[in-house]
């Protein structure tokens, strides 16, 4: 796979990057439930016809079939609700919820993985794909609380906890506070904060252009796509970091690459690579993006960008506000992409 190969000259490989084979479709359903309901109704219909003018028996059979159908549908609905679970975060006027820190795992020299317990063990977070949570912390000498958004890396269907990957930034009030936290302490959360509404096969091909911890919503989206057998979206990841050690979730992306080599490809770029590095060097540039991204004239594509301010400026231009995507600028505009083909997290 190309993500482990040297980035060679762009042109000879362009056609290779553009090609993806189609995989067979498979998806789960409630077939057994609906078949049972249909059988009950069909059986009653047959009984009606076979009994002629026996009105009392026909009426009793109809009631029995209706009751069985309702019971089957009720059981199916309960099964679905049980699988989804109760939501810890419901948005609206819910306000902040205090969550207890369960565990802390050192990921690299400046990043930790934090697992917070949800209020109840059978609850799910309530987040949808590409949504985030707001954290709040007010220290004893702080006049105003620090408010920061984070995208959980735990699966939306996981019950009882959420996971966050947090990089410690110099003078970053929230990240410094979290890196000092120990299990048993608490932090306030609120959400969910919706971003880009995703549904299976919404786009034929998407590209994820990320820098640093901007990878978290990208991972959330890629995981949802490949966890859904019905979703056949093709995914290209371009991920920039300072050093190889800074590449977060690389093992998870390598697993996707190994499992779906015809639908998922990853390209890594390092500002300070080791001598043995065979990937991209420096910054994400126009030549690389022109080579690996779906062409601007392609139908039904979407490009997602998430990273530090300097990356936004160079790649796509920044957002005006959380609700205003702003105009498209930078390399993506130069390559001919339109504003509606790009989403900035």
Curated annotation (Swiss-Prot):
Does Metal-binding count among this protein's keywords? no
Cofactor(s) needed: FAD
Q: Which SUPFAM superfamilies match?
A: Ferredoxin reductase-like, C-terminal NADP-linked domain, Riboflavin synthase domain-like
Its transmembrane ranges are 31-47
A Pfam family annotated for this chain is: FAD_binding_6
Q: Its Gene Ontology biological processes?
A: ergosterol biosynthetic process
Indicate which residues the UniProt annotation says bind FAD: 202-237
**Which segments constitute the FAD-binding FR-type domain?**
94-199
Q: Which GO terms describe its molecular function?
A: cytochrome-b5 reductase activity, acting on NAD(P)H
Q: Where in the cell is it found?
A: Mitochondrion outer membrane
Name of the molecule in the record: NADH-cytochrome b5 reductase 2
Please report the organism this UniProt entry assigns to the protein. Sclerotinia sclerotiorum (strain ATCC 18683 / 1980 / Ss-1) (White mold)
């Amino acid at each position: 796979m190309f993500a482990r190969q040297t980035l060679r000259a762009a042109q000879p490989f362009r056609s290779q990057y553009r090609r993806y084979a189609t995989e067979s479709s498979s998806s789960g359903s409630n077939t057994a439930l609906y078949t049972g309901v249909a059988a009950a109704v069909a059986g009653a219909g047959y009984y009606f016809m076979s009994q002629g003018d026996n009105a009392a028996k026909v009426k009793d059979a109809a009631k029995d079939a209706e009751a069985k159908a309702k019971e089957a549908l009720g059981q199916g609905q309960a099964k679905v609700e049980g699988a989804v679970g109760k939501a810890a975060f419901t948005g609206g006027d819910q306000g902040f919820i205090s969550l207890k820190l369960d565990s802390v795992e050192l990921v690299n020299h400046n990043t930790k993985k934090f697992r917070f317990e949800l209020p109840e063990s059978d609850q799910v977070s309530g987040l949808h794909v590409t949504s985030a949570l707001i954290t709040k912390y007010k220290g004893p000498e702080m006049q105003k609380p620090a408010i920061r958004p984070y995208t959980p890396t735990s699966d939306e269907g996981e019950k009882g906890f959420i996971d966050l990957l947090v990089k410690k930034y110099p003078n970053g009030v929230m990240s410094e506070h979290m890196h000092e936290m120990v299990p048993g302490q608490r932090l306030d959360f609120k959400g969910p904060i919706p971003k880009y509404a995703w549904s299976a096969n919404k786009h034929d091909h998407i590209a994820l252009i990320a820098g640093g911890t901007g990878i978290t919503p990208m991972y959330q989206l890629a995981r949802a796509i490949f966890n859904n057998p019905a979703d056949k979206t093709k995914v290209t990841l371009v991920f920039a970091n300072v050093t190889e050690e800074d590449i977060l979730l690389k093992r998870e992306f390598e697993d996707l690459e190994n499992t779906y080599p015809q639908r998922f490809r990853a390209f890594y770029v390092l500002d300070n690579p080791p001598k043995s590095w065979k990937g991209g060097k420096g910054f994400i540039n126009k030549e690389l993006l022109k080579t690996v991204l779906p062409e601007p004239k392609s139908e039904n594509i979407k490009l997602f960008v998430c990273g530090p301010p300097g990356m936004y400026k160079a790649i796509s231009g920044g957002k005006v506000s959380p609700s205003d995507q702003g105009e498209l600028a930078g390399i993506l505009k130069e390559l001919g992409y339109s504003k509606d083909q790009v989403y900035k997290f």
